């Protein structure tokens, strides 16, 4: 059977009364993501979520994007690139409108839309069980990174941008100029936009290589014009040209190894990334899947990035699924040219009502926010207001929560601002290197500390005669200098 004949087969053997099965897979993926965010545990528990919210609140209050640090006491006034400013404003607006429930609804709708968009695009190539497995593997790989932070808000842009470029290659034309608007949003929301530029370069070069000799000048003209518009859009940010260099500066920092998400992927225990990788290898090897050379090199780069830094699995899973789907379909002899996942209006209505019901159910019940590993709520509540105003030595993961509560931290998740030297010094302080700890206490006039119970500094301060415990629970221990202790009752 020819590819044309196969692509003409649009309807399944068993007709569904309201929608194609593929549309139901897309809708099911969207609903699953919505439920996971709205009702699943831990989505709000990341230590950076709170400082992103605080940054957004600051920008709304001042109607400006900060260029210096307004939060910490160690780097107050130091240069800071708020490169995720638009995401932070959206997060703060959602929090203002609906509290923590508003934040969950924002991210839930974004992830639901992303899942539907991803499934719809893959559904142009795969169908049925193949489509379901591809989507499940991609979303399962991304699951550890699904937290309330800006990189999740740009997921629809990542998927949409990749889809636009692949559509352009399939149609033999340059991408439409309106797509540069996606880059404008992306560059103001998260630093991963540089990968979008890389993807454009790879597929643009592929278009040039694949073109007939007499058509290459036109390819250079059309793709070059779009690339110029895209780069121009990417520098329309508060940071301008410096914003293009920021992601590379961040990834070159040696201190990233101290942060869990920047460490190498862990294969000591079987996880979804390893399972997905093995599944993809099995399918590609068993079916003789052929991937165009430049796309193969791009996939290898994605794999390298994911092995080197666990946080890149999120991007790799989405892009790899979109790149490999047509290759797998062609190897299976089931190319669906121009296929779409669709549904009748009544089905859309039912899906919309279901989504609204889920959102309403979440809004009807207050979102619980109590103590968590990154939010020492009870511990901070026991610190008097006058003591909060004094310099504190805090755990790295507590910094965001302190900012959110109006306390100036010693350190927080803005690693790019603090730099390698300060990060290395902090690692010594909390190891603890006694000399480094004593020097920091003297230099910054540390009056209190808030650290996890298993921090070596906690045991050290317990032995120090000049310090005493103010409060302790399973999440945090607060120490106060003895000279301030008499004022606390």
Residues of each region from the PLM?
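Short hydrophobic/aromatic helix or loop-helix immediately within or flanking a transmembrane segment
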Residues: 74-101, 105
């Amino acid at each position: 059977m020819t590819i044309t004949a196969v692509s003409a087969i649009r309807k399944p053997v068993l007709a569904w009364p309201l929608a194609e099965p593929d549309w139901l897979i897309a809708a099911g993926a969207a609903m699953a993501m919505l439920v996971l965010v709205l009702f699943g545990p831990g989505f709000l528990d990341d230590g950076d979520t709170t400082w992103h919210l605080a940054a957004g609140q600051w920008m709304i209050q001042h109607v400006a994007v900060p260029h210096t640090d307004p939060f910490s006491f160690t780097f107050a006034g130091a240069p800071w690139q708020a490169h995720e400013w638009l995401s932070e404003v959206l997060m703060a607006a959602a929090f203002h409108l609906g509290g923590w429930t508003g934040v969950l609804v924002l991210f839930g709708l974004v992830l639901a839309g992303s899942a539907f968009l991803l499934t719809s695009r893959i559904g142009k190539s795969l169908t049925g069980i193949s489509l379901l497995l591809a989507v499940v593997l991609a979303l399962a790989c991304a699951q550890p990174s699904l937290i309330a932070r800006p990189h999740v808000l740009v997921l629809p842009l990542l998927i949409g941008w990749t889809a636009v470029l692949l559509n352009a290659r399939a149609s033999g034309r340059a991408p439409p100029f309106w797509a540069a608007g996606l880059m404008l949003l992306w560059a103001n929301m998260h630093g991963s936009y540089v990968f979008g530029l890389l993807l454009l370069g790879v597929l643009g070069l592929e278009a040039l290589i694949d073109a007939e000799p007499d058509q290459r000048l036109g390819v250079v003209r059309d793709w070059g014009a779009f690339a110029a518009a895209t780069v121009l859009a990417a520098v329309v940010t508060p940071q301008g040209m410096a914003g293009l260099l920021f992601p590379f500066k961040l990834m070159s920092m040696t201190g990233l190894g101290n942060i869990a998400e920047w460490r190498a992927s862990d294969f000591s225990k079987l996880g979804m990334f390893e399972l997905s990788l093995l599944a993809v290898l099995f399918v590609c090897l068993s079916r003789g899947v052929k991937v165009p050379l430049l796309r193969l090199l791009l996939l290898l780069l994605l794999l390298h990035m994911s092995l080197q830094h666990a946080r890149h699995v999120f991007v790799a899973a989405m892009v790899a699924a979109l790149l490999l789907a047509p290759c797998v379909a062609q190897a299976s002899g089931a190319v669906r040219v121009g296929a779409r996942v669709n549904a009748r209006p009544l089905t859309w209505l039912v899906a919309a009502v279901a989504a609204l019901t889920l959102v309403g159910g979440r809004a009807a019940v207050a979102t619980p926010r109590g103590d968590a590993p990154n939010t020492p709520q009870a511990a901070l509540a026991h610190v008097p207001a006058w003591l909060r105003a004094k310099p504190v030595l805090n755990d790295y993961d507590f910094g965001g929560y302190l900012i959110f509560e109006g306390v100036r931290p010693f350190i927080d998740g803005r690693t790019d601002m603090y730099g390698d030297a300060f990060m290395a010094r902090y690692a010594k302080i909390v190891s603890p290197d006694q000399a480094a700890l004593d020097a920091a206490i003297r230099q910054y006039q540390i009056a209190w500390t808030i650290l996890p119970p298993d921090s070596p500094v906690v045991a050290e301060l317990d032995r120090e005669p000049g310090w005493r415990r103010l409060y302790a629970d399973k999440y945090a221990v607060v120490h106060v200098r003895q000279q301030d202790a008499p004022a606390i009752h």
